[in-house]
Amino acid sequence: MRAALRLLATATATVRPSARFLKPGSPTGLTGLGTHPSPRSALLYLYNHTLDKLKQIPEHSLYRQSAEALTKHRLAIVEQYVPDGYDAWQERARKLLEKHKSDLTARQFDGQHARLVEGPDGRAYFIRQMVPPQDWRDVEWDGAVLDPHFSWVQTGEDVVGAVKLEDSDKLLELDKIRESDPVAYRQGLRDLGIKMGGVVEDKSPVEWESEPPLSAEQIAEMEARIGSGLIEEVVQVAEGELKLVDIMTQARPWEALEEEAPEGQWTYFERKE
């Protein structure tokens, strides 16, 4: 389904230039798997970290040899595709990083969990955990405030903090609509919390510019060369491979067994002439 949509987007690119690019989060045709916002940088980060961690495994290990060969092959493919305007963006990002590095390493950035990581390849990766906005109409009201920003509000009954007289009046007004309109009730609590200083909008003064996206045609060509399904599936496989390397280095299966197998244990199963 998505491949057909890509072909259609490429064909109509002269009419709608924005159709040349895939919309992040849009359906891919696979349940639960949305379009990745920046698959190129994600794969570069995952592949380089995988290769770096594979160095902890002995060179004679067949797992290391096969994993390195596959990872290097796919990394070489990904590095060949560069989005339009990448060099100019890289220069802007470098200047922004030098000027606001302390802000970019904060736990919260633009309302999202984020961190700045330096990869083994020398690149700086800005990893952001995208949290979709929650629609309170889809949440069943159970009497508790479900907003994670409400660290000072435990339930709808008790409010911790200095409450001014006008704020007390506002709380009384909100309490009247608690059962009839829980959505407005919670939104009013949040607005009041921000005013009181108990709830802080976690937004950095720095506006980070994301990497220019690859075109739909570039992604389709990359998928064809890698040959492992959609690019989002390739990212998931790369994430699993990185986790597997961690498990292998912890288990150290290349070392001798703690309890050696008894001599002749497998003799019965040998194929004899």
Curated annotation (Swiss-Prot):
Extent of the transit peptide: 1-8
Localisation: Mitochondrion inner membrane
Keyword annotations: Electron transport, Membrane, Mitochondrion, Mitochondrion inner membrane, Respiratory chain, Transit peptide, Transport
InterPro entries with a match to the protein in the record: NDUFA5
GO biological process: respiratory electron transport chain
Membrane topology: Peripheral membrane protein
Main location: mitochondrion
A cellular-component GO term for this protein: respiratory chain complex I
Family recorded in the similarity comment: Belongs to the complex I NDUFA5 subunit family.
Function recorded in the entry: Accessory subunit of the mitochondrial membrane respiratory chain NADH dehydrogenase (Complex I), that is believed not to be involved in catalysis. Complex I functions in the transfer of electrons from NADH to the respiratory chain. The immediate electron acceptor for the enzyme is believed to be ubiquinone.
Assembly notes: Complex I is composed of about 40 different subunits.
Protein name: NADH-ubiquinone oxidoreductase 29.9 kDa subunit, mitochondrial
